[in-house]
From Swiss-Prot:
One Pfam family this sequence matches: DUF2340
Full protein name: UPF0538 protein C2orf76 homolog
InterPro entries per record: UPF0538 (IPR018794)
Species this chain originates from: Bos taurus
Homology family: Belongs to the UPF0538 family.
Length: 126
């Protein structure tokens, strides 16, 4: 079976408290690659994107979580849902397809430490 190439939106989350995020669209993403390989690709690609402001290009992203899948319901959370971590956080050793990624899925890329701190105390600054 040939590998499937899809379009994925990656939401770069710089700050949960300030709701500071920037979406980046990736076309031709191979679903048979591992989550770890995709994270490595993102860490190499993001600093090279001149369209992103420096705070987004130079941030310490390390974790992926599904925000929204095509044709499914969306959450009311403005930045990222704090629910269903066991189902929506992507495990590095699985493939993107096995993790539930399909065409037009939106995933968040963020610092896991920031996420844990925000989840423990979910207060927005504005």
């Amino acid at each position: 079976m040939a590998s499937e190439d899809v379009t994925i939106t990656v939401r770069l989350i710089r700050s949960f408290e300030h709701r500071n995020f920037r979406p980046v669209v990736y076309h031709g993403v191979h679903l048979d690659q591992t989550v770890k390989d995709f994270i490595v690709f993102l860490k190499q690609d993001i600093p090279l994107r001149a369209s992103l402001p420096p705070p987004f290009r130079n941030y310490k992203y390390d974790k992926l979580k599904i925000v929204h899948q095509a044709h499914k319901s969306k959450t009311n959370e403005l930045v990222l849902s704090l629910e269903d971590d066991d189902r929506l956080l992507l495990k590095e050793d699985s493939t993107l397809k096995a993790a539930g990624i399909a065409s037009e899925t939106e995933i968040a890329f963020f610092c896991e430490e920031d996420y844990k701190n925000y989840k423990a105390n979910p207060i927005s600054s504005w």
